[in-house]
Amino acid sequence: AYWLLFTAYALEYRVQETDFATLRAQTLANGEILPTFEEYLIQAKKNTATKLIIEIKDHNTPARETRVVKTILKMVKQHKLVNDVEYIAFRQFVCDELVKYGPKGIKVAYLNGTLTPEYCKGLGYTGIDYNLKVMQKNPQWIKESHDLGLTVNIWTVNDPEGIKWCIDNKVDYITTDNPAEANRQLGSKIDFPK
């Protein structure tokens, strides 16, 4: 089984190296058990208004990464969520495999911050998803990305100044652990849990 790792819960196990029973026995900080990817997809079908962003973590070998990519793509298709999912990964090989094996129009964004927007576009990616510090060093990448039809997400932006920088520079998405502050700055009407 493939697992979704909730890093916010700081489990003390490496998912790839831990057996199913051990992982399943863990209680997360919020009192829930760690869901399988299958359970995550079942829950996601209940709220298709929410876009699913699936991050595929690095694995030990390219063969294993290819197997993980193919399995995830198959499961997403089986659950009829193909149009409700976008994929992100730090490893270029994983992004390449998603483009290679995924359906036409698959949405893939590269996370590592080492490739230019033009290069990402040439690889068939649909976005860049870089750390705030990378983008602050390369702010021209926002306009370049948009001119190429790529989306721009910046992670993980929690402080008010960083959120303001993202908004002022017209990024498409902000990954944050502080959605209330992002909401406040955007003037949105979305109610986030406290």
Where are these regions (language model features)?
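Metal-dependent phosphodiesterase/phospholipase catalytic core, i.e.
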Residues: 2-107, 146-148
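C-terminal active-site rim and adjoining tail of enzyme catalytic domains
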Residues: 107-194
